[in-house]
Amino acid sequence: MLVPLSLLQKFFSSPLSIEEILQACDRIGIEAECSNVFPDSLNTVVTGKILSASPHPDAERLTVAIVFDGKGERQIICGAPNCRAGIIVPIALPGAKLRNASGEITTIKKAKIRGLESQGMCCGADELGFPHLQKAERGIFEFPADTPLGESACMLLAGAPLECSLTPNLGHCASLLGLAREISFLSPVSLNIPEEFSFASLPQETSICDMHDAGACPVFYSVKISGLSCRRSPEYLQAALTALGQKPLNAIVDITNYVMLSLGQPLHAYDSQAVEQKSLHAATLQSAQPLTLLNQETYTLPAGSLVVADQHNILGLAGVMGSAASSCSENTTEIILEAAYFQPQAVRKYQRTIQLHTEAAYRFTRGVDPQGVLPVLHAAIHMIQSLFPDAQISPIQKIGDDSFSPLSLSVRPKTIKRLLDIELSTAEIVAKLSSLGFQTAVEEQAVRVEVPSYRHDIQEETDLVEEICRTTPFVQKTQKILPTYTPIYSLKRELTAFLANGGLQQFFTYSLLDTEVSSLSLQESSLIPVQNSSWKLRDSLLPGMLKSAATNLHRQAPYVYAFEIGNVYSKEQNRYQEEERVAILLSRQVMDDSWQGKTPLSFYTIKGWVEKLLCQSGASIEDFSLQPSQHPNFHPYQQAALYQKKHLLGIFGTLHPQLCRKAQIKHDVVFAELSLNVLLSLKKKSGPHYVPYPIYPASSRDITITIDRDLPADLVRRELLSFESKWLESVHIVSVYQGRDSASQSKNVSLRMVFRDHERTLSGQEIEEEYERLTALLDKKLANIGQGNS
């Protein structure tokens, strides 16, 4: 965004130096730099006002001028014919170096001219390197009467010395008014609205239109203005638009562009001859339709696009560009001027679809001030009246509701302390936020804040903390060394090192999946599509890893042992969620050529890796339970879900053969995917717990129990461990047997119970009694949840 200093200064109660403006932009978060660089010698060319001008006593063509340069008066002998009292001109102070028409450099010095001392030189624009601004063949350049004195003349003549880059959250700064308002909050000046934007309220009428889309366009204003002509704009308006980076077209269009760039609210003028019944409204297309816009390009507007229309015709793409058929031409004498508030999400949707970027779309997609629509319309009408005194203005037509309910948020001192490590009282919070234009009220241990209508970037308490941060000098902020790593980052480093040391290679795959990769999932409908493209956001690490594994195997890799840590995305209750996960994928056995023969990968291979991962994460395996799973990407009988109480940690198992065939992998593939956030929440804060090695022997007893085939074998083990016993040290599953008869509804589970006392050796009788007690409790427990027989 180009920002002419001469125009920006009009919005301040008193002028600011370039350094002050740049410092304020830096605190706002705007990257600003001078787009024109001048030699240091030209910095001594400043603006000065001629207080008096009298003829030189010894020369007819010379004038003795007394000039005030912002600091003091000085006498300058000038030969320009337009040298007169009251004008503001460029003054080259002694030491300035100017280049003449032949290219030679002249150093300005104090000198006597016909017996009188001259302490500088009054310059023309061509002598400073701006010949295109010189209006007369001979003469000094004249600045507007409101130009501040003592400022760099070259910076003012350059037109756009500042080039500002706005981040998406600073849409309210995309105008001279918005930028000046933010600078005034952080500078010793107040905001000043120039007289050219002053206005008197005009009559207003409310209209009802059944076709108007009030959801996408809460309020829509239009006004008919007649008695106009599309002549060229005055020179000052053309110069201002050029400095702002816009090409002047005609008086009507130039006014709408100038008001938009100055005040931030886009406007559009329609030739009333193209508008049926002289009435406009905003409507949503029910089906795709073609439309030729002002750039003479024809676009197919998708269904759902918001358009500006009359009773039968589309006259413009709302918030982006008007149609060619309704544009103002040299024959236009009557216009309908439109100003509206279009919802950012509505404009953003179709603007990206047709890939058309305009100044209006830039502002609407970031959010304009809903309470500034009518004042800006009044300002534009005022400027039109100043250029066309005989213009007739009809009453303003309003469709929709212009009422506004400000967002109310609370900010607490403890939140500021937690995020910024700064102690602030409620009174200090009120002072800081009030200085930024927020309405505040003190509550119990908090400050209630009303967000201004133009601040679309303020949505929650942390946004207010950011505002407080930028008003706090660095010297007041605590200087402390931040933690080296966040807990989640530390966990990722630990898991990466562990898995890499275990022989696994790390994969890095894209979060966006194309059509080919996204098809490597039997649950494709759950992927989140990216608007206007065939790409989709992944909801699992599986598709990308499976594609990479297939690529490696097709290139004769003997095996694939890989892992990946990355983000996945999902949509729950109309809200998008982002989660970090760790995944392991194994295909083919590393030791296929061993003398022991081939040992194929199985469900238990990946189960072992999951258990290792849990141990490495610092979580206790006993805190988890395995439950049946029916995920379509896995083999229906070789998968399991891992739960911690009611929280799903992840799913693992053998991939579905159909999915392996889609990936053109001939071997079995086992896969596991776990949530890092759940792992982190279960990590033991105290670290590993060490116990002394037992000095007394342990004794074991085996038990085989028949249970329902649908009951998990691990359920029996957990039930045994849940019984209170001072001697039962551990329980392991030895085997699970199910007969070949498909009609059998039971299976045998063999377990080994280990008993030990850490203070003495247990007798055989004590072990037998404890064993009998536990098996009796187990039979009773299993009777309630399924058939059990030990």
Curated annotation (Swiss-Prot):
GO terms for cellular component: phenylalanine-tRNA ligase complex. One of its GO terms (molecular function) is tRNA binding. It holds the Pfam family tRNA_synthFbeta. SUPFAM superfamilies: Anticodon-binding domain of PheRS (SSF54991), Class II aaRS and biotin synthetases (SSF55681), Nucleic acid-binding proteins (SSF50249), PheT/TilS domain (SSF56037), Putative DNA-binding domain (SSF46955). Its cofactor is Mg(2+). It comes from the Bacteria. Binds 2 magnesium ions per tetramer. Keywords: Aminoacyl-tRNA synthetase, ATP-binding, Cytoplasm, Ligase, Magnesium, Metal-binding, Nucleotide-binding, Protein biosynthesis, RNA-binding, tRNA-binding. The keyword ATP-binding applies. Mg(2+) binds at residues 457, 463, 466-467. One of its GO terms (biological process) is phenylalanyl-tRNA aminoacylation. It is found in: Cytoplasm. It catalyses: tRNA(Phe) + L-phenylalanine + ATP = L-phenylalanyl-tRNA(Phe) + AMP + diphosphate + H(+). SMART domains: B3_4, B5, FDX-ACB. It is an enzyme of class 6 (ligase). Coiled coil: none annotated. InterPro entries: aa-tRNA-synth_II/BPL/LPL, B3/B4_tRNA-bd, DNA-bd_dom_put_sf, Fdx_antiC-bd, Fdx_antiC-bd_sf, NA-bd_OB-fold, Phe-tRNA-ligase_IIc_bsu, Phe-tRNA-ligase_IIc_bsu_bact. Tetramer of two alpha and two beta subunits. Belongs to the phenylalanyl-tRNA synthetase beta subunit family. Type 1 subfamily. This is Phenylalanine--tRNA ligase beta subunit. The lineage of its organism: Bacteria, Pseudomonadati, Chlamydiota, Chlamydiia, Chlamydiales. The gene is pheT.
